[in-house]
Amino acid sequence: MAVTAAMVKELREKTGAGMLDCKKALVETDGDMQAAIDFLREKGIAKAAAKGDRIAAEGLTAVAVEGNKAVLVEINSETDFVAKNEKFQTLVNNVAKAVLASGATTAEAALAAEYEAGKTLETYIQEEASTIGEKISLRRVAVLEKAEDAVFGTYLHMGGRIGSVVVIDGTSDETVAKDVAMHVAAASPLYATRDEVSAEEIDREKKVLTEQALNEGKPANIVEKMIAGRMNKYFEEICLVDQTFVKDSDFKVGKYVESKGGKINSFVRFEVGEGMEKREENFAEEVMNQLKK
């Protein structure tokens, strides 16, 4: 498979490795992006790719809650200027409420739902976009539900650049729930518990860590013990219950919630633009600057 400049760019953004290292990794792995990431990590050149990679899009997230259901939405605009516009902020909140009322669980279903008599949510967004003067789109929707004896925690960071919702069972303590939602926004966990991590992902991580240890010259007979310790650290980075609580470093998040009589059920976190392509305009200039060195 031919390795393109766009592929090198994507790998560099995901790993922070140099362009030549990225190109070599892609050549060695026949253009397989995940395999190339693992290749760079095994060589000690790159860290694990963060969830969402680089962020390019503008917009806001918003939360709507009613009873035992909560909705988190992400709406994109073309510029940060519009994202700070009061009309856009009103639109985002209206969309979140409309999605909650519609019962939709996907962006596609939400857009097709009725917003008001004779008008779909998609039409409402298009009309407001014409007034605001930019393309505006509902990118994604997440719906969480809770039991009667559970509580929602919600948090919007930087006016909505990051939005999070958590469900905590066994308590009605909204302060605890909000604190955990703030932690989710700050620490960006990928999973609630270790049970949610797939066997495939665990096996891949063990392989990478094993190769790292062997490349460091560690004796094979102690590599297995090292891997066990490093896997625990890996879970502490990606699993909410195992992360060190940002508001009290004496606690892991799961233990903190348990100390308050609750148990973490689930969460969702949106960061505006995560996973979307970075704009292309500066890549050629960046390459030229590297070649001049």
UniProtKB/Swiss-Prot annotation:
Spell out the molecular function terms from Gene Ontology.
translation elongation factor activity
Q: Which GO terms describe its cellular component?
A: cytoplasm
Q: Does the keyword Cytoplasm apply?
A: yes
Keywords (A to Z) from UniProt: Cytoplasm, Elongation factor, Protein biosynthesis
Where are the residues of the annotated region Involved in Mg(2+) ion dislocation from EF-Tu?
A: 79-82
Its main localization is cytoplasm
Q: Which domain of life is it from?
A: Bacteria
Q: Where in the cell is it found?
A: Cytoplasm
Gene3D superfamilies assigned to the protein according to its UniProt record, in alphabetical order: 1.10.286.20, DNA helicase RuvA subunit, C-terminal domain, Elongation factor Ts, dimerisation domain
Q: Does the keyword Magnesium apply?
A: no
Family membership, please give it. Answer: Belongs to the EF-Ts family.
Record's function text? Associates with the EF-Tu.GDP complex and induces the exchange of GDP to GTP. It remains bound to the aminoacyl-tRNA.EF-Tu.GTP complex up to the GTP hydrolysis stage on the ribosome.
What is this protein's name?
Elongation factor Ts
Instruction: Please name the source species.
Output: Exiguobacterium sp. (strain ATCC BAA-1283 / AT1b)
* Name of the encoding gene: tsf
